[in-house]
């Protein structure tokens, strides 16, 4: 009996340690703490996938790019992270962002500014369709543009995908990202007359700023936030 109790205790401790490690590096994304705002703050919704959420970033709650952006902007702004791992712009893909409760929460937040970046997960072979990507992403962005708060929308071109040990992780496709998704995002921004921030160019040849070739590390998140900060401050 004592051995069983000890075994259960060991399993419990290991489980707690594993969960803590996964949480620390942003692999557990069911927890989305939202900041409360006062009426004088400018509200910013950062919408996207695991890159926005901060997956693989050490101490993700502090070092995800929306958190860093919040620190750069200061108390005049309320920045909330609406990133959700593995989500797509394409509605017929495996995990569409618009199907999630978090999407509705981002709309209900009634932001003054929306910073949105999707596309990496759309590059998967079983997901990718250029026409659907453009149509569905335009529809999603329009859902923010038509909010009563009339937010400014900044669409981010996703960063490059880098090979690790000869391949890109998470079944993402570099050729689709480089040759189809990046041009499509720029086309969407132009079509909807919204701001476009080209993170693909910002991170070109900067593989050292990525933890797994896909997700920026803490230093990469700082650069990510800095570029968004510079554009927002120049436009506000």
Model-derived segments and spans:
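N-terminal secretory targeting modules
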Residues: 1-47, 51-59, 67-76, 108-109, ...
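A general marker of short, structured functional hotspots
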Residues: 19-20, 27, 61, 80, ...
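Short, mixed-charge, low-aromatic patches
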Residues: 20-30, 53-63, 92-99, 139-142, ...
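Alpha-helical cap/lid subdomain in secreted, periplasmic
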Residues: 98-236
């Amino acid at each position: 009996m004592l051995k069983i109790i000890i075994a259960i205790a060991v399993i419990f401790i290991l489980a707690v340690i594993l969960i803590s490690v996964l949480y620390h590096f942003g692999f557990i994304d069911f927890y989305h703490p939202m900041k409360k705002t006062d009426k004088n703050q400018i509200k910013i919704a950062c919408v996207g996938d695991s890159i926005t959420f901060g997956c693989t970033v050490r101490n993700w709650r502090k070092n995800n790019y929306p958190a860093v952006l919040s620190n750069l902007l200061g108390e005049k702004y309320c920045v909330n992270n609406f990133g959700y791992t593995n989500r797509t712009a394409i509605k017929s893909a495996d995990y569409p962002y618009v199907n999630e409760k978090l999407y509705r929460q981002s709309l209900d937040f009634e932001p003054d500014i929306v910073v949105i970046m999707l596309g990496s997960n759309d590059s998967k072979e079983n997901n990718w369709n250029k026409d659907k990507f453009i149509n569905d992403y335009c529809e999603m962005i329009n859902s923010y543009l038509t909010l009563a708060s009339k937010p400014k929308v900044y669409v981010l071109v996703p960063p490059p995908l880098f090979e690790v040990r000869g391949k890109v992780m998470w079944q993402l496709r570099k050729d689709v990202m480089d040759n189809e998704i990046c041009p499509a995002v720029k086309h969407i921004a132009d079509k909807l007359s919204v701001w476009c921030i080209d993170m693909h160019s910002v991170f070109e040849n900067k593989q050292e700023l990525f933890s797994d070739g896909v997700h920026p590390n803490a230093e990469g998140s700082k650069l990510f936030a800095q570029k968004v900060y510079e554009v927002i401050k120049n436009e506000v």
